[in-house]
């Protein structure tokens, strides 16, 4: 289900829907405040780095976790991801194995993350952390755990889509937030806004220094150079992510000729019937069917080879604040160039 449009109105231009739902938003915010105030049930003997958000929905957490997996690996640190496994049926803790698990079992995000390093699915994050420690983890990357009090966190990084920012600044259902901005940022150590320069400028205009007083990282999602020539490719594109239009825009930036686009719900199941229909649509237009890297792991195995995916990676404009935070957490780690 797509979020309502009024969630992303400017914070100084609230409509009647946001105002009418504000009392329910206050109840939601109070429930979140009570939850995050609980003392952690488990403090692992290794550093815990949390990647989360204040907004509901997609903000770029998965590419951020992938980037941290690669950064920590370059320091010689065995980092294990612990994820709830949204969309999967396994409660865990279970180590994700792309050779035997599918997205219906463990969720699409853990399945993708497992390609970059050890990844655990666990409804009980503390149990997942214990399993990771027992398997030799030297650090835990807690995926989407910012409002989860189960684990004590050593570093919390909040990720925001720079174009959308914090939406209208109101809490669900009056807006897109899981908790008020000021309250959430007060618990965070780093803020990462993801988007091109124009989006970063928009974020600054709406949420500038008066709101953001913690170290602020900026980054953008850039297509991974795989040797694939995208320019001039006729494509029918589909995406079941938080903001499908961002993916379609990225394809156009690569010179792809979009014959049709199909925005799907976030994490929407991709059954053979749907993909066969999209493949037929692409064939009728003399085009190639294209999707995101995250959607690709949900494709039926028998049709996966007929769909192209465009992988993207997070590129940080300035990683000084992140490097300093990691140096503090891992003072004895050796950076490898």
UniProtKB/Swiss-Prot annotation:
Record's catalysed reaction(s): a lipid A disaccharide + ATP = a lipid IVA + ADP + H(+)
SUPFAM superfamilies the record matches: P-loop containing nucleoside triphosphate hydrolases
GO MF: ATP binding; tetraacyldisaccharide 4'-kinase activity
Family annotation (InterPro entries): LpxK, P-loop_NTPase
Binding site for ATP: 55-62
E.C. numbers: 2.7.1.130
GO BP, sorted A to Z: lipid A biosynthetic process; lipopolysaccharide core region biosynthetic process
Region forming the signal peptide: none
Enzyme class: transferase
One annotated Gene Ontology cellular component of this protein: plasma membrane
Pfam families registered for this protein in UniProt: LpxK
Recorded metabolic or biological pathway in which this protein acts: Glycolipid biosynthesis; lipid IV(A) biosynthesis; lipid IV(A) from (3R)-3-hydroxytetradecanoyl-[acyl-carrier-protein] and UDP-N-acetyl-alpha-D-glucosamine: step 6/6
Record keywords: ATP-binding, Kinase, Lipid A biosynthesis, Lipid biosynthesis, Lipid metabolism, Nucleotide-binding, Transferase
Role, per record: Transfers the gamma-phosphate of ATP to the 4'-position of a tetraacyldisaccharide 1-phosphate intermediate (termed DS-1-P) to form tetraacyldisaccharide 1,4'-bis-phosphate (lipid IVA).
Family statement: Belongs to the LpxK family.
Protein name in the entry: Tetraacyldisaccharide 4'-kinase
């Amino acid at each position: 289900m797509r979020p309502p449009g009024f969630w992303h109105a400017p914070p100084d231009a609230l409509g009647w829907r946001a105002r009418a739902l504000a009392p329910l938003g206050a109840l939601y915010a109070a429930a979140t405040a009570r939850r995050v105030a609980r003392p952690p049930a488990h403090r692992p003997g290794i550093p815990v780095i949390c990647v989360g958000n204040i907004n509901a929905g997609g903000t770029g957490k998965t590419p951020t976790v992938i980037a941290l997996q690669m950064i920590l690996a370059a320091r010689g640190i065995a980092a294990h991801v612990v994820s709830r496994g949204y969309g999967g049926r396994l409660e865990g803790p279970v180590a994700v194995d792309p050779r035997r698990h599918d997205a219906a079992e463990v969720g699409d995000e853990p399945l993708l993350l497992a390609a970059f390093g050890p990844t655990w699915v666990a409804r009980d994050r503390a149990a997942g952390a214990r399993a990771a420690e027992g398997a030799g983890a030297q650090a835990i990357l807690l995926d989407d755990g910012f409002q989860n009090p189960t684990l004590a966190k050593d570093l919390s990084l909040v990720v925001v889509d720079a174009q959308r920012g914090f939406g209208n600044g109101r809490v669900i259902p009056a807006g897109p937030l899981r908790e008020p901005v000021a309250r959430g940022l007060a618990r965070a150590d780093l803020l990462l806004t993801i988007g091109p320069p124009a989006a970063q400028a928009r974020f600054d205009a709406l949420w500038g220094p008066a709101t953001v007083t913690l170290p602020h990282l900026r980054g953008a999602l850039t297509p991974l150079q795989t040797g694939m020539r995208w320019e001039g490719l006729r494509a029918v594109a589909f995406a079941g992510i938080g903001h499908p239009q961002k993916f379609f825009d990225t394809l156009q930036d690569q010179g792809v000729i979009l014959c049709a686009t199909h925005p799907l719900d976030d994490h929407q199941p991709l059954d053979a019937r749907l993909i066969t229909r999209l493949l037929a649509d692409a064939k009728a237009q003399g085009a190639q069917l294209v999707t995101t890297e995250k959607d690709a792991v949900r494709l039926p195995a028998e049709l996966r080879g007929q769909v192209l995916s465009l992988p993207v990676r997070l590129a940080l404009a300035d990683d000084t604040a992140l490097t300093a935070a990691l140096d503090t957490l891992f003072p004895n780690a050796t950076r490898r160039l």
